[in-house]
């Protein structure tokens, strides 16, 4: 047997003017904030990922692939030695 939770029905919320006034402002602002977060480079700094021009330096232009399962630790140490 189902009962009422006392919450407003979703249909009432979506059709209210207050809902649309609030969301026509907040949803575009969320997209704008996300775009600024990525375009300014702050996302790279916060999450510690390298920028697109920092993946490869002049000394190493190839991909650092681990090719041997049992010597993987040694290969990773060789890759990170120059960093």
Swiss-Prot record:
The keyword Glycoprotein does not apply. It is a single-pass membrane protein. The chain crosses the membrane at residues 21-35. It comes from the Bacteria. It is found in: Cellular thylakoid membrane. One of its GO terms (molecular function) is iron ion binding. One of its GO terms (biological process) is photosynthetic electron transport chain. SUPFAM superfamilies: Cytochrome b559 subunits. NCBIfam families: cyt_b559_alpha (TIGR01332). This b-type cytochrome is tightly associated with the reaction center of photosystem II (PSII). PSII is a light-driven water:plastoquinone oxidoreductase that uses light energy to abstract electrons from H(2)O, generating O(2) and a proton gradient subsequently used for ATP formation. It consists of a core antenna complex that captures photons, and an electron transfer chain that converts photonic excitation into a charge separation. This is Cytochrome b559 subunit alpha. It comes from Acaryochloris marina (strain MBIC 11017).
